[in-house]
């Protein structure tokens, strides 16, 4: 069994008198794909912001590979629902942006960018600008940029929430291929229960505020998954019922 890579212990986060996250403890194994679901407004994004260190915590600890999270030392990528491409850069330049910041050797960076663009179907669009791309292509750019830096940890905050179902499934399948090939640890926030069951190896279910972990459900289904299969539907219904009734 893989060792724990992310360890969260008794995490509590408040904004003034409002307790958003309350005594949250969980761990994520190295290379695991974890989905986190919960009702709208329960603090899922705050949860990720604490993991990155963007928000301090009022109590508890967050460890990455046994150490406090230090973004200068660790290789963490973050993909949001809002498109985060840089409009003045081409697709190729956007994908290369993280590698440029990290000062990777030019030849190595160029080869990595071309490799990742090929995997997500961006090669033909490499010299275009974000304004020329569709919504799904913009998210492909964000995904390619994230995987280009070969992150230890990839945090995803409802990245496909604005896409229609056909585009979402295509991007989910691309994400799974990249995850399997890279071995990256993924924490994926979503309000879409079917998406969580389709992607993850394990699901954390959050409560309403003050948010805590209500349940942890393993997803022991092989990929590729059939959303109409009886075992898939049963698991989706189980998660739905847990979120519906508090």
Residue ranges and their predicted role:
Residues 52:
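Helix-to-loop junction immediately C-terminal to a conserved catalytic motif
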Residues 129-133, 137:
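Conserved ABC ATPase signature
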Residues 107-125, 177:
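Conserved ABC ATPase "signature" region
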Residues 92-100, 110, 114, 218:
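Short helical segment in ABC ATPase nucleotide-binding domains corresponding to the A-loop/adjacent helical element
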Residues 37-39:
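The feature captures the beta-strand-to-loop junction immediately N-terminal to the Walker
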Residues 148-152:
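A short, proline-enriched helix->beta-strand linker immediately N-terminal to the Walker B motif
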